Amino acid sequence: MSIKTIEGTLEATNLKFALVVSRFNDFIGQKLVEGAVDCIVRHGGSEENIAVYKCPGAFELPAVAKKAALTGRYDAVITLGAIIRGSTSHYDVIAAEATKGVAQAGLETMIPITFGVLTTENLEQAIERAGTKAGNKGFDAALAAIEMVNLYRQV
């Protein structure tokens, strides 16, 4: 008896994506969008199959992601943004709720919804993760979305 391993491929040809990005910390969000688009195109996707939805902040990401998933127009939804710690507990609340909300939206819709939202201690860390020293987490979130779409199709 052999164990069958099933994995998603990294092929984005003909896949349709919704990118839901927070406008708060917009400079970082735009860099994450650029990384996600780059990933999709490098893996055979086209810019014509990508829609970008901008919402006010990270707290609103789950609702817009769920609504986009429920339209049936997209194979996957990629959430992007940056939550940067400040001097109050607001960061902790927003980071927890955005993370939980995006995960819940994915479970409720059964459409792959990936989390490309940076949660950093400072702006420098966010910049590093949006395309400089630590790669681009938007690219990583798009790669996960591509793989998940192709895995879902085999389950």
From Swiss-Prot:
Quote a single Gene Ontology cellular component term. Answer: riboflavin synthase complex
| Chain residues that bind (2S)-2-hydroxy-3-oxobutyl phosphate | S87, T88, R129
Q: What SUPFAM superfamilies does the annotation carry?
A: Lumazine synthase (SSF52121)
Q: Name one GO molecular function term.
A: 6,7-dimethyl-8-ribityllumazine synthase activity
Please state the pathway this protein functions in, per its UniProt record: Cofactor biosynthesis; riboflavin biosynthesis; riboflavin from 2-hydroxy-3-oxobutyl phosphate and 5-amino-6-(D-ribitylamino)uracil: step 1/2
Q: Which UniProt keywords apply?
A: Riboflavin biosynthesis, Transferase
Which reaction(s) does the protein catalyse, per the Swiss-Prot or TrEMBL entry?
Answer: (2S)-2-hydroxy-3-oxobutyl phosphate + 5-amino-6-(D-ribitylamino)uracil = 6,7-dimethyl-8-(1-D-ribityl)lumazine + phosphate + 2 H2O + H(+)
Ligand binding (5-amino-6-(D-ribitylamino)uracil): F24, A58, F59, E60, A82, I83, I84, F115
Q: Which residues form the active site?
A: H90 (proton donor)
Q: CDD domains in the record, alphabetically? A: Lumazine_synthase-I
Question: Please, one GO biological process term?
Answer: riboflavin biosynthetic process
Q: What EC identifiers does the entry list?
A: 2.5.1.78
What NCBIfam families does the record point to? Answer: lumazine-synth, PRK00061.1-4
The UniProt similarity line reads: Belongs to the DMRL synthase family.
Q: What does this protein do?
A: Catalyzes the formation of 6,7-dimethyl-8-ribityllumazine by condensation of 5-amino-6-(D-ribitylamino)uracil with 3,4-dihydroxy-2-butanone 4-phosphate. This is the penultimate step in the biosynthesis of riboflavin.
Name of the protein in question: 6,7-dimethyl-8-ribityllumazine synthase
**Higher taxonomy:** Bacteria, Pseudomonadati, Chlorobiota, Chlorobiia, Chlorobiales
